[in-house]
Amino acid sequence: VRLEATSEAATAETYAPPAAAGESFDWFSAWYPLRPVSFLDANEPNELRVLGKKLVAYLDPTCKEWRVLEDSCPHRRAPLSLGYVQKDGTLACRYHGWAFDGKDGSCVSIPMSVDEAAEKTACASPRSCATSYPSRVEDGILWVWPTAGADGLLASAGAPCATSLAREGTLPGEWGMVELPVGYAPALENQFDPSHAEWLHARYDAEGQLDERANAGFVAMTEFSVREGTMQKDGFVVEHGGYNKSNVGVSASRVFTAPCSSRSEYLDAKGKKYLSAAILYAPTEPGRTLMFTKFQAHQASAVQGAGARKVSPADRINSLVTAPATSLFDFYVDNFTSDPKLVRVGLSHGTPPGSSAYNLGDQDILAMHGVEVEMELQNKPWKQSYYLPTPADAGVSAFRNWMDKHAGGKVAWAPGVVDDASKVKSEAEQLDRYHRHTKHCVACKTALSELGVLEERCVAASKYLLAGGLFLAVTGAAFDQEAPAIIATCLAGASLVGAEKVRDMQHEFLSSVPRRGVPKPKLW
């Protein structure tokens, strides 16, 4: 059904009949993105989750292939993610040393066996095996099929990952990824609601000139529809026009490949490429969802609203004043850190200007969290809780109708996972950055670790310099030599200032809540 503005108020509220037999989406028969490969630690086990399943991924050093197992040792159910990767490609449990072949989960070593025969017998038992899952690397991402055993291997073998289905092909560049502290439904709704950007993110347009209460020149959407014949168990396609003055002439399509992929293509009025966006989602556990992003702007105006801020005269002055310290920090990173290249990647994620992307994420999260909590409190079907009277709401309606018709209305979690916890999270939890991104990214963890080392070195240097300054002050007084003491004391002060600056940098990786003053960020 095509939705267009008429003389009457257009509505996005449509009815989706229940799916017929065989038309239901199977949540456990699909590829899910786990991490960009660049985020994974190639030397250690990586703790992961999807659909409530606790998983561990590691790189087999013998064949350079990623293995995915259930994060549970069959011996005493300790997390295998606490273990270590051995040279022979097996994953050893740190609790009692049991070792597993990541390819099929078979147990290959039980160190506490009384003899070789007993070990062989125990390893041959199916009860000694860890649970392995089909996995693959595609488009720079590690994917998992969340059904184990022969059924999972057979079903996954011929099934493509969502990114390979994009008619326009994959996008260039690296994937970004965060774990949103909100559930799957509000996260996907946000993606199918493009007009929210003109209000929620209004102040962060590319020019940086808007008042915090202003919108970015919105244009009412007059067309937003589900492409005829596309609403099926495997997804759907929606088409819409522009929604602000910079993209008023565009035509866009958003292809939803269930359960995780939304690929958007924007064309300008002449049919030329305007903007491409690939966004992936994976429900990790109730109330948390992975989001992967990759964008390609084909025209300059397509970056409007991307979160940039106009450089002010104060910014330029500050840049000049801090230039010597910046150069010294760059020298330190290049010469005194464990992996300068990796540290720089982490710094580009976690510190300004790269960390400015957190501002937009914070805005989205606060809004989505509010929606999720209110829906929980009302405990009503979405059609009763939401009032969707405009064409701009058609994307949300389309997604909700797909969920109702084909996906059972909600995520199907792994056995034993119950979605009964309160959706209410404190503002500090919503604005947390460590669990949103840092802990998932090996570059950010490395950068944060190195900043901790630098802080300790700055504090130690200040102590030694201050002690030296006091000594030089005493001895210098006898010889009328005050300059060395003054220099040492100034350097001690500079080291303390440096340590405080490094603490500020570390905080950027941990939270959007300000480190000083009122614990509430200014987002608009």
Label each region the model flagged.
Residues 99-100, 113:
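Short Cys/His-rich micro-motifs in 6-15 aa windows
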Residues 62-65, 77, 143, 150-524:
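C-terminal catalytic domain of Rieske-type non-heme iron oxygenases
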Residues 100-107:
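Short metal-binding segments enriched for Cys and/or His
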Residues 2-88, 102, 116-160:
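N-terminal pre-ligand scaffold of iron-sulfur
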Residues 74, 91-94, 108:
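Cys/His/Pro-rich metal-binding microdomains
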Residues 81-83, 107-111:
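Aspartate-rich (DDxxD/NDxxD/DxxxD) Mg2+/diphosphate-binding motifs
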Residues 93-96, 135:
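Hydrophobic alpha-helical packing residues
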